[in-house]
């Protein structure tokens, strides 16, 4: 009989083991056996909690997306000024948070993006995440720019976030957060000078 309260602990262990396995060997080679071994549980536990490897990958992506949301939210809540510039910078900072730019997270995001082209559930998660970023950026830009310009500026910032993040992920070096923030802040400032 399973111990009461173990489900959240086991799920977290398996998600962390999945991140570690993808970081070390890639998603394709991260087998259920290997992930279970890393988590110190039997293979059957993965089936019990997640159905299969796809279910575990989906849960892992939800975990990363949840941490992304928390990173953005905490920065927005800690702002001392409520200006569009400050709020846009907070959104960017959250997207470049260590929870999203550490090696395991970056490799898992890359695998997720590639897999989302072939998995309807992962594609839906990717679309929700994309829309949330675009919507948050659009709302802030629309506080001081006409709607059409706000949308274009939001696409530009989202493109910079994704592009800088992707270049960082593919470089095999530690992500240069300060450089990414500086480039993105400059773009935001350029857009806001037209307000």
From Swiss-Prot:
Would I find Transcription regulation among this entry's keywords?
yes
- Involved pathway(s): Amine and polyamine biosynthesis; betaine biosynthesis via choline pathway [regulation]
List the stretches of this chain annotated as a DNA-binding region.
Answer: 31-50
Q: DNA-binding as a keyword?
A: yes
Residue span, HTH tetR-type domain: 8-68
Extent of the signal sequence: none
Against SUPFAM superfamilies, the record matches this protein to: Homeodomain-like (SSF46689), Tetracyclin repressor-like, C-terminal domain (SSF48498)
Concerning Gene3D superfamilies, the annotation shows: Tetracycline Repressor, domain 2
User: What's the superkingdom here?
Assistant: Bacteria
Fetch the InterPro entries from UniProt. Answer: BetI_C (IPR039538), DNA-bd_HTH_TetR-type_CS (IPR023772), Homeodomain-like_sf (IPR009057), HTH-type_TetR-like_transc_reg (IPR050109), HTH_TetR (IPR001647), Tet_transcr_reg_TetR-rel_C_sf (IPR036271), Tscrpt_rep_BetI (IPR017757)
Question: Which keywords annotate this record?
Answer: DNA-binding, Repressor, Transcription, Transcription regulation
One Pfam family recorded for the sequence: TetR_C_6
User: What is one GO biological process annotated to this record?
Assistant: negative regulation of DNA-templated transcription
Which GO molecular-function terms appear in the entry?
Answer: DNA-binding transcription factor activity; transcription cis-regulatory region binding
| NCBIfam families xref list | betaine_BetI (TIGR03384), PRK00767.1 (NF001978)
User: Its biological function?
Assistant: Repressor involved in the biosynthesis of the osmoprotectant glycine betaine. It represses transcription of the choline transporter BetT and the genes of BetAB involved in the synthesis of glycine betaine.
From the Swiss-Prot or TrEMBL record, give the protein name.
Answer: HTH-type transcriptional regulator BetI
The organism is Pectobacterium atrosepticum (strain SCRI 1043 / ATCC BAA-672) (Erwinia carotovora subsp. atroseptica)
Q: What is the lineage of its organism?
A: Bacteria, Pseudomonadati, Pseudomonadota, Gammaproteobacteria, Enterobacterales
């Amino acid at each position: 009989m399973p111990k009461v309260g173990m489900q959240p602990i086991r799920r977290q262990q398996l998600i962390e083991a999945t991140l570690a396995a993808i970081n070390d060997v890639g998603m394709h080679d991260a087998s259920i056996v290997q992930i279970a071994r890393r988590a110190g549980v039997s293979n059957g536990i993965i089936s019990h909690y997640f159905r299969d490897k796809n279910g575990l990958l989906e849960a892992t992506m939800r975990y990363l997306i949840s941490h992304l949301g928390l990173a953005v939210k905490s920065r927005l809540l800690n702002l001392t000024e409520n200006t569009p510039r400050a709020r846009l910078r907070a959104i960017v900072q959250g997207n470049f948070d260590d929870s999203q730019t550490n090696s395991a997270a970056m490799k898992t995001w890359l695998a997720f993006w590639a897999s989302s082209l072939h998995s309807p559930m992962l594609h839906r998660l990717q679309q929700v995440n994309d829309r949330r970023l675009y919507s948050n950026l659009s709302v802030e830009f629309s506080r001081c720019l006409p709607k059409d310009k706000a949308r274009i500026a939001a696409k530009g910032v989202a493109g910079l976030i994704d592009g800088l993040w992707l270049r960082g992920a593919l470089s095999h070096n530690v992500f240069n957060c300060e450089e990414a923030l500086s480039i993105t802040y400059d773009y935001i400032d350029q857009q806001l000078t037209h307000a």
